C-alpha cells in the first residue's frame, strides 16, 4: 500500500516536473517569437530612417551643385539654422536622445537608466537624427538606429506584458536589430550586442538578437538590395608573406597611434564645447557655418562623409596632399558635430576617417613601389576596419560588418 502511495507521488511529481519544463520552453518560444516581431518593427522604422537620410543628402547635393542665386542660399541657411535650434531644444528636453545612443542603450540594458517615455523619445530620436543629418552634420546613422531598436524592444516588452527578467533581452534584441537594419548585417548586429551592449554571451540573448537581426536585415535588404561598398575593387597586393607582415604591422601601429589620439580628443571636445557659455542659437550658428562652407566646396564630405569615401574607393585621387587636407577637414568637422550633442552616431565618421587614412597610406606605398594603384582601395578597406577596431574596440563586429556590407566571405 505504501509502495503504491509512493509511486503515485512520484508520478505526480514527475508530471509536475515535465509540465514545468514545458512551461519554460513555451516561455522561451514566446520570447523568440516576440523578438522576431521586434526585429520586424525595428526594420520598418530604422529602414525608413536610413532612406530619409539618403534622400535628404541627394536633395542637398542637388541644391549645392545647381548653382542657385545667392538669396536661395541665404533662405536655406536660415531654414537649416532653425532646424538645428529645434533639434537642440529637443535634446535639452529629452537628454537621452543626445548623441549616438549606444551608451544610453547599454546603460538601459544594465539598469543604470530607465526609458521613462520610450515612445516620445523614439519619435524625437527619429526626427532629430534625420533633421540633424539633413543639415549636413558629420554624424552617423548606426547609433540612432541601435537606440531606436532598443526603444521598440522596450515598448513591445511593456505592451506585451513580458516577464521583467526578459525585458532586457528584448531591449538588446531591438538594439541589434537596429544595427542590422542600418547596414543589412544581421551577424554583426548580434556581435555588437555581445561585445558592446550585453558584454557576455548568454545563449538566450544571442538567439533573440540573431532572430531580430535576421528579420530587420531582411527588411533592409528588401529596401536596399545592393550596397555601394561592393562596388569598391579590393585587389590584394601581390607581396611575399614577409613583406605583407611588415606592411600590416607598420600600418597597424600607425592606426593604433592615430586612433588613440582620436579617442582622447573626441571626449575632450565633447566636454569643453558644451561647457562654453554660449546660447543654443549661437552654437548652432557656428556649427551650421562650418557645415554650409563644406557643402559649398565638397558636398560629399558632409552627412558623415560616406559618399566621399565611396567616390574615393571607386575612382579616387592620387593627390596625397589634397586627400590629407580633406581628411583633416572631415576630422575637425566631425569633432564639432559630435560635440554638439545632436542625435547622430560616430560609426560612419570613424569609418570614413579610417578609410581615408588607409587610402593615404596606400598612396605612400605606391610612391615607394611596394604596391600598385589597383591595391589602394584594398588598403582603404583595411584602414576602415583597423581604425574602427582601435577606436570602438569591437573587433569581431567591425570585421564581420565589413564582410557583410561587401556581401563577400573571402575577406
Stretches with model-predicted labels:
Residues 1-411:
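Alpha-helical transmembrane segments and immediately membrane-proximal extracytoplasmic
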Amino acid at each position: 500500500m505504501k509502495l503504491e502511495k509512493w509511486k503515485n507521488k512520484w508520478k505526480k511529481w514527475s508530471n509536475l516536473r515535465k509540465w514545468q519544463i514545458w512551461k519554460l520552453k513555451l516561455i522561451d518560444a514566446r520570447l523568440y517569437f516576440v523578438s522576431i516581431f521586434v526585429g520586424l518593427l525595428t526594420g520598418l522604422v530604422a529602414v525608413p530612417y536610413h532612406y530619409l537620410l539618403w534622400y535628404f543628402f541627394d536633395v542637398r547635393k542637388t541644391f549645392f551643385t545647381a548653382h542657385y542665386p545667392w538669396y536661395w542660399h541665404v533662405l536655406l541657411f536660415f531654414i537649416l539654422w532653425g532646424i538645428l535650434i529645434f533639434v537642440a531644444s529637443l535634446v535639452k528636453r529629452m537628454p537621452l536622445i543626445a548623441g549616438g545612443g549606444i551608451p544610453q542603450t547599454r546603460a538601459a540594458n544594465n539598469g543604470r537608466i530607465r526609458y521613462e517615455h520610450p515612445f516620445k523619445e523614439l519619435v524625437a530620436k527619429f526626427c532629430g537624427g534625420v533633421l540633424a543629418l539633413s543639415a549636413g552634420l558629420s554624424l552617423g546613422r548606426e547609433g540612432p538606429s541601435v537606440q531606436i531598436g532598443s526603444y521598440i524592444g522596450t515598448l513591445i516588452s511593456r505592451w506585451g506584458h513580458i516577464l521583467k527578467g526578459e525585458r532586457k533581452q528584448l531591449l538588446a534584441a531591438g538594439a541589434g536589430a537596429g544595427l542590422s537594419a542600418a547596414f543589412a548585417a544581421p551577424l554583426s548586429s548580434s556581435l555588437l550586442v555581445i561585445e558592446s551592449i550585453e558584454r557576455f554571451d548568454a545563449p538566450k540573448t544571442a538567439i533573440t538578437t540573431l532572430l531580430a537581426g535576421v528579420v530587420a536585415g531582411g527588411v533592409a535588404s528588401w529596401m536596399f538590395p545592393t550596397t555601394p561598398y561592393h562596388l569598391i575593387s579590393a585587389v590584394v597586393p601581390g607581396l611575399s608573406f614577409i613583406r605583407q607582415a611588415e606592411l600590416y604591422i607598420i600600418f597597424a601601429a600607425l592606426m593604433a597611434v592615430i586612433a588613440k589620439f582620436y579617442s582622447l580628443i573626441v571626449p575632450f571636445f565633447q566636454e569643453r564645447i558644451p561647457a562654453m557659455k554660449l546660447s543654443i542659437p549661437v552654437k548652432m550658428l557656428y556649427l551650421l557655418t562650418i557645415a554650409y562652407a563644406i557643402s559649398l566646396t565638397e558636398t560629399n564630405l558632409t552627412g558623415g562623409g560616406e559618399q566621399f569615401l565611396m567616390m574615393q574607393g571607386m575612382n579616387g585621387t592620387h593627390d596625397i596632399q589634397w586627400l590629407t587636407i580633406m581628411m583633416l577637414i572631415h576630422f575637425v568637422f566631425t569633432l564639432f558635430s559630435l560635440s554638439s550633442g545632436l542625435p547622430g552616431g560616430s560609426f560612419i565618421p570613424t569609418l570614413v576617417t579610417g578609410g581615408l587614412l588607409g587610402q593615404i597610406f596606400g598612396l605612400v606605398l605606391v610612391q615607394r613601389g611596394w604596391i600598385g594603384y589597383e591595391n589602394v582601395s584594398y588598403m582603404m578597406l583595411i584602414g576602415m576596419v583597423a581604425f574602427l577596431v582601435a577606436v570602438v574596440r569591437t573587433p569581431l563586429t567591425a570585421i564581420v560588418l565589413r564582410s557583410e556590407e561587401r556581401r563577400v566571405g573571402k575577406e
